[in-house]
Amino acid sequence: MVVVGKTSAIAAGVCGALFLGYCIYFDRKRRSDPNFKNRLREKRRKQKIAKERAGQSRLPDLKDAEAVQKFFLEEIQLGEELLAQGDFEKGVDHLTNAIAICGQPQQLLQVLQQTLPPPVFQMLLTKLPTINQRIGNAQNLAEDDVE
């Protein structure tokens, strides 16, 4: 019985050492690649650009009333559809976008409070500050572009 435990411990130790050697070998091989740093920088740059585009492209020009109204209606519709499908996270994201650019957010919040289940409405309330901050940043960027 002691022999089986000792054998298992030795086997586990050997497997761990082999795994560690495998990790070290491939990490060294990857790092010694002359293009590794360039590919890593390029990958990070593309991710950063994609993230910026995803955040900025969704918001309409806040000075164009027609674009804002169209965006508002699309976001409400998408939010309702996603909530009906059970995708609460994305549905709430769209509803928060609509609330953030709405001219009368308090009235819209009252309507949503009456129509949404309480947990979904709470999720909506927790996401509002982040979307308001994002829209504020987008307005600041637009003002900086004008100057």
From Swiss-Prot:
Residues 1-3 are mitochondrial intermembrane. This is Mitochondrial import receptor subunit TOM20 homolog. It is a single-pass membrane protein. Keywords: Membrane, Mitochondrion, Mitochondrion outer membrane, Phosphoprotein, Protein transport, Transmembrane, Transmembrane helix, Transport. The chain crosses the membrane at residues 4-26. One of its GO terms (cellular component) is mitochondrial outer membrane translocase complex. Forms part of the preprotein translocase complex of the outer mitochondrial membrane (TOM complex). Interacts with tom22. Central component of the receptor complex responsible for the recognition and translocation of cytosolically synthesized mitochondrial preproteins. Together with tom22 functions as the transit peptide receptor at the surface of the mitochondrion outer membrane and facilitates the movement of preproteins into the tom40 translocation pore. InterPro entries: MAS20 (IPR002056), MAS20_rcpt_metazoan (IPR022422), Tom20_dom_sf (IPR023392). It comes from the Eukaryota.
